[in-house]
Regions:
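Bacterial N-terminal signal peptides that target proteins for export
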Residues: 2-12
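Short glycine/proline- and aromatic-enriched beta-strand/turn motifs that initiate or cap beta-hairpins
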Residues: 28-50, 73-84
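A generic hydrophobic-helix recognition signal that picks specific residues
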Residues: 45, 52, 222-224
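Outer-membrane beta-barrel translocator/receptor signature
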Residues: 50-58, 63-145
Length: 439
């Protein structure tokens, strides 16, 4: 009976999160910097830190230490992205312009619940999201008949990618993670979380790429499309001394259904969530202080829609049409390693202060095989965060955190307009507020 209620709750939460959370800005590729208020404040360095019920989003084994708890979290995101092209010559000179994304303010809710069944077993659920590839560039060349596909665009001016009208992507991944943790020895736990995923995707303004596709009608401007998928996360958590805890977690690739409306755009027609894993350590050097350090690895190279280079479909669309296994992708050809450092200080019995920093080298290169799609989905490579928790007289906790995410300027040669240079530099601000209650 409890299992049925647990699974039914998972389905309800998935629908709620999907309805409310359409965008997340990234701290590791398009992965969020962290999930839940503690992770936001510690810049994601929580593989070995058990402070809330969001274990299913990082390390399911930590749930053994969470007790009976409810966490509600809301993040206000303010991403800023601008693309620019210079150096195009001749008839293409009209494409030397810049455009700023109109998508600049999003609300992202998260939810987690944990329950201690007995001394060894805990169950719970986490709901969270990935995203960050959400852009809308409304500027154009301003010159009639400069688009690269007059069959679809007529005499309209060309947008930044050579199509017509607004240029954009809208991608969100919404994950519900029912979690089971087992404390098999004092201070030692194992955990598992099925990753039940709902994904949405929309692309528009990409008419210039339709002739290079295996299915030209399924490249752009087809509205929102949806896909379901599943994977699994497993983890281990250990407390060895009052001053030391360690953790490790592995998430399989989440295999997604194909997007029927965009099977002519995405390599293999789908957008799987890449496998990822992390190890973490938390130490308490003195009373009231905690230092946490994580290393996370995200295997972007295992998802063709992300890792395939840009050139295959542009240089040989017959052998490598868009939407095929070898078709063009975003050029994220390198797996990403993220380093995360967090510090926590309990200033008073009521007030806890936190801060964190994370860095990960960008997954794509600044070359001809990456830049033209890469500038449309460029994400930050580092982030810094600060935050606090206030414990009320009633026993509930109020959390507030602030983060800035940014990245070095991403610039390189254009694969669409020979001789031109394209660039982008993303940055974002985030404010997280949350409420926790022991149940």
């Amino acid at each position: 009976m409890m299992l049925k209620k647990w699974l039914r709750c998972s389905s309800c939460v998935l629908l709620v999160v999907f309805a409310l959370a359409a965008h997340v800005y990234a701290g590791g590729g398009y992965f969020a910097m962290g999930y839940g208020p503690i992770a936001w404040q510690l810049a994601g360095a929580v593989t070995a830190v058990s402070e809330d019920a969001f274990a299913g989003a990082s390390n399911p084994a930590k749930l053994s230490m969470a007790g009976n708890q409810l966490d509600l979290s809301l993040t206000l995101l303010n991403p800023n992205r601008k693309v620019e092209r210079t150096g195009a010559s001749g008839p293409a000179s009209g494409y030397n312009f810049s455009s700023t994304s109109a998508n600049s303010l999003f609300l992202v809710p998260e939810f987690a619940y944990s329950r201690q069944v007995n001394e060894q077993v805990a169950i719970g659920i986490s709901a969270y999201a990935n995203g960050g590839m959400n852009i809308e560039y409304g500027d154009s060349s301003g010159i009639p008949a400069t688009n690269l596909n007059p069959a679809l665009c007529g005499t309209k001016p060309g947008n930044f990618a050579g199509g017509c009208g607004k240029l954009g992507f809208d991608m969100g991944q919404f994950i519900v993670a029912p979690t089971l943790a087992w404390q098999f020895a004092p201070g030692q736990s194992l955990g598992i979380s099925p990753l039940l995923t709902l994904q949405m995707f929309k692309a528009y303004g990409l008419q210039a790429f339709a002739p290079s596709s295996r299915s030209p009608r399924h490249v752009t401007n087809n509205g929102q499309d949806y896909a379901f998928g599943a994977g699994v996360r497993v983890g281990w958590f250990g407390e060895f001394k009052p001053c030391l805890s360690l953790g490790a977690a592995y998430s399989s690739k989440v295999y997604m259904q194909d997007f029927d409306k965009y099977k002519g755009l995405l390599a293999e027609g789908s957008f799987d969530i890449p496998a990822n894993y992390s190890v973490g350590m938390a130490i308490k050097p003195r009373h009231g202080w905690l230092l946490a350090f994580d290393i996370q690895r995200i295997e972007f190279s295992g998802v063709r829609a992300l890792s395939n280079g840009i050139l295959p479909s542009l240089t040989n669309p017959v052998a490598n049409p868009l939407g095929s296994k070898s078709g063009s992708g975003f050029g994220w050809q390198r797996d990403q390693t993220n380093y995360k450092l967090g510090v926590m200080y309990q200033a008073t019995p009521q007030l806890t202060l936190r801060a964190g920093y994370t860095y990960g080298k960008r997954a794509n290169d600044n070359d001809l095989n990456s830049v033209s799609f890469g500038v449309l989905a460029v994400n930050p490579i580092r982030a810094a965060s600060v935050g606090m928790t206030w414990k009320t007289d009633s026993g509930s906790e109020l959390h507030m955190g602030f983060a800035r995410m940014d990245g070095a300027k991403y610039k390189g040669p254009s694969a669409i307009f020979p001789g031109a240079k394209e660039s982008a530099r993303p940055y974002a601000y985030a404010v997280n507020i949350a409420w926790s209650q022991a149940m």
